[in-house]
Each structure stands twice: as structure tokens, then as C-alpha cells.
Regions:
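Glycine-rich phosphate-binding/hydrolytic loop that grips phosphoryl groups
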Residues: 121, 322-359
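Short Gly/Thr/Asp-enriched flexible loops that form oxyanion-binding sites at enzyme active sites
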Residues: 84-110, 301-310
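A contiguous, well-structured pocket-lining segment that forms one wall/lid of small-molecule binding clefts
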Residues: 33, 194-291, 302-309, 313-314, ...
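Conserved phosphate-binding catalytic cores of ATP/NTP-utilizing and phosphoryl-transfer enzymes
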Residues: 110, 115-137
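Short beta-strand scaffold segments in enzyme catalytic cores
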Residues: 13-19, 138-140, 146-150
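N-terminal beta-alpha supersecondary unit
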Residues: 2-78, 84-88, 117, 121, ...
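Glycine-rich phosphate-binding loop plus the immediately following alpha-helix
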Residues: 119, 130, 153-198, 226, ...
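Conserved phosphate-binding/catalytic loops in two-lobed NTP-binding clefts
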Residues: 114-115, 307-333
Length: 365
């Protein structure tokens, strides 16, 4: 069976065709995966502008779907279902994908499958590597999310922890903007960090020991927090630029390249250490047989290297998506859609977007 996946949760318009392989160990194969990025549009504004994003999705969606079907050598009558990201994300962006998918499914007489965006990221690990040894602890880390999930059976995701404030990718973008490095910040900080001294600056690591009152069901000690780190970088930069107190006017004189590289390296070391430590602490606590990292920040070179090194030291298998599957894409949505379709989880054609959709609402029944 082949399924069409559609992803428009933020600023990438993507469509993909994924098919079942008949191999239980590696159940899915990508026939096409088309992504139209809006980075050039939003770079001018220093971040994603929701109104611009949704308008660009409208311009791109038909052509992207046509390209995905053409590259996959697949006609509408060859498809078994249509899968679409229902949420979470930017509501205007989500509505474009959901509206297209519901109309297409109705016109073609195909079942519609609603997919949670983070479930797609988790299933990107299976799409890339085959079924993971379970139970597995998966870190989903991106510009909008930083969470740990326990996967005890295929298609079931239990939230273990989350960020209390900024997502890791969001912190990267904010620090990059502070340093005048442009948007998106993750790739440029990763590149500059390779030339910097990651011990040049003493930056704080937040260690939480209490439960979040907004999520009392979580223990709290596995939660993340990056706002304090971001503020520490801000104070350090202001001191360097103006030689004044943090609340005094800052100088416009640019920082030396070496200083910026040292800040990038020190910041990245603290972020990656926090991510990897909590991931493996969770793996030990829940006796996981594997760990994985998914989402846009999983493309970070230091995170990939540290994950591999820690996994080898702990003698636990580690899994990552390819770089192409790290960022938002429709192939992962199609894969998650196939999982839900086989579980009998079909959506009605009056499906609506949900910008704050909880992942636990989409557990298998």
C-alpha cells in the first residue's frame, strides 16, 4: 500500500509518497519526499512570520503534491490513503495542509489519516533505521519542542519530560540573533562552534529537581530549561560589547570572530550536554533497550557525535534520522499515517487543525 503524506505545520510545505515493504523489521520505503522551504522568506524577518508562512503554503501546496506523485510514479488511484499533520504547529499553516488533504481524500475517495507532528518525528527513526528495540526513549528536539518520550510498543508514545520554557532550537535561534548571525541560528552556531573553545565561557546548566505544577504527572527532574542559559549569554555579550552593566545601553561595535566562535561553542556544549544527559538518565530509569533523537536539532553535529559516544560507552543502541528526515518533511507524516491506518485510526472528513494537539490524544486504541 502507498500513502500520500502532507506536512505544513510551520514553514515547510512538504508532500511525500511512502509505501509498505512487507518487511516487519523495516516496514516502510520512501518513493518521494518533496520539501519547499521558506527559509529565504523568513530570514529577512529573523524568524517565522505566521501570516507569510500560511500564504506561502497556499502558493506551494498544489505544485508540491503534484511533484511528489510524479516523482513516485504514482497516480491518485494507486494510493490507499492520505495522511496529514493535524497539529501542533501554526494554526494558519496547519489549516492549509488539512484543508487540502480533506478535499483530496474526499475527491479521490480515500481514507484520511490525522497525524501528530511529533509522532511523525518519532516515526522518522523507524523510517530511517527500521523498527527500534523496545522499550526506547526518544528525544524530540526542534525549534518548537524539546521532549522525551517512552515508546513501549509501536505507535504508543508516553511523555516523560519537556522543556519548561524555550525549546532547544528556539534558544539556538535567539542566541544567533543576539550574536548577529541571522536566521535560522542552529546551523550557523553549529558551524562556528567547531572553531571555538567550548570551555572559554562559564555558562550555567539548569538542573530541575521538582515537578512542574502545570504538569504534575511528570517527575520534573528530567525536564529541560534553556531560558537561564540564554539570559547568561545575553549578559555576557552585553558586558563584552559595552563594558557596562547588563541593563545599560550596549555598544554597536561588533564582537571579534574568535569571541563569537567561543560563545557559540560554549553555548552548544551546555545545550548538548543537557540533552544527552537527560536522554540517557531516562533510558536508565525506564530500562530502555535503545535511545533515539529526532527533530530539526538532531541534525546538529555535536549532538550526533555525543549521542554516539555516550551510547557506545553505555552499550545501548542509538538511532538518528538522516539529515533529510531531521527537518520537517512529509515522509515522516506518511510513515506515521501508515502506522495509524493499520491500527484502524481513520479521521473524518470534517477534520480540523489543532495548534496545541497533545500527543497522548493519538495513542493507539
Amino acid at each position: 500500500m502507498r500513502i500520500l503524506g502532507i506536512e505544513t505545520s510551520c514553514d515547510e510545505t512538504s508532500a511525500a509518497v511512502v509505501e509498505e515493504t512487507g518487511d516487519a523489521a523495516k516496514p516502510w520505503s520512501i518513493r518521494s519526499n518533496i520539501v519547499a522551504s521558506q527559509v529565504a522568506i523568513h530570514r529577512e524577518w529573523g524568524g517565522v512570520v505566521p501570516e507569510l508562512a500560511s500564504r506561502q503554503h497556499i502558493r506551494d501546496i498544489c505544485g508540491v503534491v503534484d511533484r511528489a506523485l510524479s516523482e513516485a510514479e504514482t497516480a491518485w488511484e494507486d494510493l490507499g490513503a492520505v495522511a496529514v499533520t493535524q497539529g501542533p504547529g501554526l494554526v494558519g499553516s496547519l489549516l492549509v495542509g488539512v484543508s487540502y488533504a480533506t478535499a483530496a481524500a474526499a475527491a479521490a475517495g480515500l481514507p484520511l489519516v490525522a497525524v501528530h507532528h511529533l509522532a511523525g518525528h518519532i516515526e522518522s527513526l523507524v523510517l530511517q533505521n527500521g523498527e527500534l528495540p523496545l522499550p526506547s526513549v526518544v528525544l524530540v528536539v526542534s525549534g518548537g519542542h524539546t521532549s522525551l518520550y517512552l515508546v513501549e510498543q509501536p505507535g504508543s508514545y508516553q511523555l516523560l519530560s519537556r522543556t519548561r520554557d524555550d525549546a532547544a532550537g528556539e534558544a539556538y535561534d535567539k542566541v544567533a540573533k543576539l550574536l548577529g548571525l541571522g536566521y535560522p541560528g542552529g546551523p550557523v552556531i553549529d558551524r562556528l562552534a567547531k572553531t571555538g573553545d567550548d570551555r572559554a565561557i562559564a555558562l550555567p546548566t539548569t538542573r530541575l529537581t521538582h515537578a512542574d505544577r502545570n504538569a504534575p504527572e511528570l517527575k520534573g527532574d528530567l525536564d529541560f530549561s534553556f531560558s537561564g542559559l540564554k539570559t547568561a549569554v545575553l549578559r555576557h555579550v552585553r558586558d563584552l560589547e559595552s563594558g557596562a552593566a547588563p541593563d545599560e545601553p550596549r555598544s554597536r561595535a561588533p564582537l571579534p570572530d574568535k569571541t563569537i566562535a567561543d560563545i557559540a561553542a560554549s553555548f552548544q556544549r551546555v545545550v548538548v550536554t543537557a540533552l544527552v544527559e537527560r536522554l540517557f538518565n531516562a533510558a536508565r530509569r525506564y530500562q530502555a533497550r535503545s535511545v533515539g533523537v529526532a527533530g530539526g536539532v538532531s541534525a546538529n553535529s555535536r549532538l550526533r557525535a555525543d549521542l554516539k559516544e555516550r551510547g557506545e560507552r553505555r552499550e545501548i543502541p542509538t538511532f538518528l534520522p538522516s539529515l533529510a528526515l531531521s527537518t520537517d518533511n512529509a515522509a515522516m507524516i506518511a510513515a506515521a499515517g501508515l502506522r495509524r491506518f493499520r491500527a484502524g485510526q481513520i479521521a473524518s472528513l470534517d477534520l480540523n487543525a489543532d495548534a496545541a494537539l497533545p500527543l497522548h490524544d493519538q495513542r493507539p486504541t
